[in-house]
Amino acid sequence: KILTGYTYKNSFKKWSFNYQGLMNLSSLSFNTVQGWNLDSGFSYRKWNDENGKYTSITSTFNYGFAEERLRIKGNYYHRFNNQNNAYISLSGGSSINQFNNSEPISNTINTVSTLFFKNNFMKLYNKEFAEINYGREVTNGIFVSGRVIYENRRALFNNTDYTLIKNDDAYFSNDPLQPNNYTSTPFQKHHIIKGQIGTRIRFGQKYISRPDGKINIQNDDYPVLSLSYEKAFAGTNKNYQYDFIGAVVDYSKTIGNKGDFRLRFKAGKFFNADNISFVDYKHFNGNQTHVNMMNNSLNAFNLLPYYSHSTNDAYLETHIEHNFKGYIMNKIPLLNKLQWNLIGGFHQINVPNFKPYQEVTVGFDNIGWGKFRFLRIDYVRSYQNGFQGEGVMFGLKF
């Protein structure tokens, strides 16, 4: 059990315990900072179906073999009820993180890209942190949340050149701005405190009240609006302090038998941020691997380098997609037997000092056989002050 892990569940008293084991091979991955690395940890969960209370306590141990470094972090989460979904969470410890905290490249994809193609796209830094979050629905359709986080950040270097292929190419450095810079760091070691408040508004939301909770019913005639304000203060260097406001609009609508229409607009603006740490820039979810395992077509780009358009100013991000379902394909003899769905999309970034970056996509979803339809394929063309490039994106859904 020490090596393989252990799980115990008491359904009568409604609690469970899990230990992942020292050989948690499902977490095994590779990057050029840590080399081979894996996770272990413990988790305890307790729940009450009658009033919606839920508590979890988790710990994660991550060890990088080339770095010879153990990182430990923990999290406490408690949901008070199923009526307004009020919750509080506390977390802290040491972790290794991508510069883009949305983590646009997964551990699995980065492992394959690095070991087989020497494309080490994942760029990482270290942080020790402590964080508290609280949120609740204040009235029907309006959810408010806030958090305060302390971070002590440190840049990292590559610690291995191990690969499964043999050629003369060298790995890029761990600097997202200067991939051929192996001697200096993209930022100086520093600490900072950040406070954030946000709200999510679901216009026209209806609900059903039950003794065991509130069931929300979203009205697809209206968009969902999210607003946020963030302030960074108490930094090692005053230049790292800034203010930021952001907004996200999400909308999805089924248009009769003509398919599903979806869009997402994201906008934001930094203030007093001329010399902030690159960690705090707005980073866009790019992709240079031609593989997407996250099913996040409204939150990512297909051919965009990961940090080419990062900004500490203003930005507008646009994603539009229409899935025709069977509306077109079902009208084409023979092809209708495939049960594929035609999809078209448009994606754009607007940031100062750059021409708009755009992607136009067309592809097929629901590719596979029987109940196993896990593949999506898109043909992508990118434009910025003219045609930039083209490629094929493979989307995997498991």
Regions found by a protein language model. Name each.
Residues 1-34, 41, 104-255, 343-345:
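Transmembrane beta-strand segments of outer-membrane beta-barrel domains in Gram-negative
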Residues 17-30, 46, 52-78, 90, ...:
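Transmembrane beta-strand segments that form the barrel wall of outer-membrane beta-barrel proteins
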Residues 34-38, 68-72, 126-130, 189-195, ...:
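Residues that define the transmembrane beta-barrel architecture of outer-membrane proteins
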Residues 48-55, 82-88, 141-144, 154, ...:
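Repeated loop/turn-to-beta-strand initiation elements of outer-membrane beta-barrel proteins
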Residues 59-63, 76, 88-96, 146-152, ...:
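Transmembrane beta-barrel strands of outer-membrane/channel proteins
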Residues 71-74, 101-106, 156-163, 210-215, ...:
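Outer-membrane beta-barrel translocator domains and adjoining extracellular loop/strand segments
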Residues 87-108, 112-123, 184-185, 217, ...:
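C-terminal outer-membrane beta-barrel translocator/porin domains of Gram-negative envelope proteins
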Residues 161, 168-190, 278-370:
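Outer membrane beta-barrel transmembrane domains
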